[in-house]
């Protein structure tokens, strides 16, 4: 083109825009002070400009004055100071004296302040540090202005009013270097969804086209734009003005503004004709949009979560996937995710909110019983279960108790929403209650010490544990609602009261919970309604110290067996156990005949009716007759029963003497004997599911074949014994009978028979062997 203007066809990115105000409020009234401080020698020209006529009238004096004031007025000096300061700032960012950047500075006379627009783009300036750089930029601009003011001191000292402006500039400079900008520098910002402000990058060429260039010139508030702007360079529709413009260190003259604007519109920035408008021009009629298109285009955009929300959602998914219920579970399962969320503002509070949301989700989805089965799936009840053993020791039917616990935990027991384990110390009540609540895991505890907020920990829980329960008149009324499963509002510390839904309660205590204590009085008014809400089990037998703790999996085994076998509702419980109503004191168990509550007899399993252990079954084939293996070398004269003979034992030993058993177990068990392998109950407990691999399949086939061989050998042995017993035996003659009686005939004729031994020494025969075993 025919002009030499500082045309920008490309601008460095990213680009940000600043606005710097001149820090003097009464600058319009004291405009002459700015003339003398920043542009000395231009006072007379500015006064003459006030008296010039506006265009379209021809005024040669006006043209000469405007040419003389080209870049010497205080607006131009202010724009130069801003450019030098911005260039210095970019040099610091890029660590060079000659930074590679693009800078546009335009000073303007506003309604309140003299200000300067700065467009700067280049490496070293980013979205993160552009906002922080405001104080540095303001300090550099104020330093340039104070240096400009000091040039006047070479000719004359400051007037008092001039000194006031100078000291104000120095004060703003000191505050800027300390980080305080006041309201003297601003940057274009945007607000995010959280309300935080961030630096807004801009399109510099479009900003030049639409905001910087289409303005008329005004160099003094006492003049007018039609005086300071020539008719050829007048923007008809522009209502804003500028004072001076600098692009990359060169002034943009008034006569070149329109040409530069036209070049930006036609060549640099694509216009509407080049866009995808179907070939229509900028002023042509746009296509009509139908109603259906408006409806379809009125769809809401997808919400994009920020970093904090994504972390919270990930943590909530982890809690649901891994069943994380408390802070300790988060530390052990996902510490990396926990640390990232802790690093966010208010991270501890966010973690509490996530856990609270997960608790609400679990309570809405599960009951205490279903969540217990969710945590402990596919449990098989065995006769070595400690929960089964404890209930049998205390005299209860463990299956009936398990049925009742299932109904309570599943919220199907009607008004009886509480199970109370009552008894003295060391009877297993806390052991049993702790196993139940730890199996559920999401439980709350009642705290007597915090008297104002006793049930503070009971909200958003699947089950409540009331350890060492004690009724007091301060909390007996809400306690009756909670024990009966009625919804009520409870007080929570530092929060409003919350609604407590029906939550099963487990109590372990050695106090009388039906007596209400208040001050120095004990009341029994609430005893009847409390008993209607509580199902009490009395544990009165102390357990040995070697009993051990009941694990949550053992509780899950018992409850899962009862849940699969019985109808876990109030009607099903009463129908199964033939009850008209469920009493407050749980009924004692009634064992079947020959069934025992002794844990030493647990190998054969338990009864599915009374819960007792099944009796032992013995096999006579593993025993043999001792008399058949006794020889004369093993003869013991003490077994004769003769008190006159010599005996080394004392009378006390004779009194306590118990004859030896006539049967004994064979020391070496035959390999085909049923006792040589595991029992049938042990085999069934071991192979309750299919083998998981080839090794387990091989072991299963070996044990199964061994059981088949044992069964076959036992049947063959029984048949052989039966056949031997049915064979005809020859009738013994008198001589044979005499030999059996210990009488032999004499070798010499006429002599009496010889008696070999006394009848007292005769061993019992096979016929009376069973009568003498274990008897005297």
Curated annotation (Swiss-Prot):
Residues 606-776 are annotated as: Transactivation. Residues 193-197 are annotated as: Ori-binding. A motif (RCR-2) lies at residues 115-117. Pfam families: HBoV_NS1-like_N, Parvo_NS1. SUPFAM superfamilies: P-loop containing nucleoside triphosphate hydrolases. A motif (RCR-3) lies at residues 211-215. One of its GO terms (cellular component) is host cell nucleus. Residues 11-271 form the PV NS1-Nuc domain. Residues 397-552 form the SF3 helicase domain. Its main location: host cell. Residues 674-690 have a biased composition (Polar residues). One of its GO terms (molecular function) is helicase activity. Keywords: ATP-binding, Covalent protein-DNA linkage, DNA replication, DNA-binding, Endonuclease, Helicase, Host nucleus, Hydrolase, Magnesium, Metal-binding, Multifunctional enzyme, Nuclease, Nucleotide-binding, Transcription, Transcription regulation, Viral DNA replication. It is found in: Host nucleus. ATP binds at residues 423-430. InterPro entries: BoV_NS1-like_N, Helicase_SF3_DNA-vir, P-loop_NTPase, Parvovirus_NS1_helicase, PV_NS1-NUC. Its cofactor is Mg(2+). A divalent metal cation binds at residues 108, 115, 117. Its EC number is 3.1.21.-, 3.6.4.12. The endonuclease active site can probably bind other divalent cations. In the N-terminus, the endonuclease region is involved in binding to the origin of replication. In the middle, there are the ATPase and helicase activities. The C-terminus probably contains a transactivation domain. Belongs to the parvoviruses initiator protein NS1 family. Multifunctional protein which displays endonuclease and helicase activities required for initiating and directing viral DNA replication. Also plays a role in viral packaging and transactivation of several promoters. Binds site-specifically to 2-3 approximate tandem copies within the origins of replication (Ori), unwinds this hairpin region and nicks one DNA strand thereby initiating the rolling circle replication (RCR). Becomes covalently attached to the 5' end of the nick and provides a 3'OH for priming DNA synthesis. Homooligomer; when bound to DNA. This is Initiator protein NS1. It comes from Human bocavirus 4.
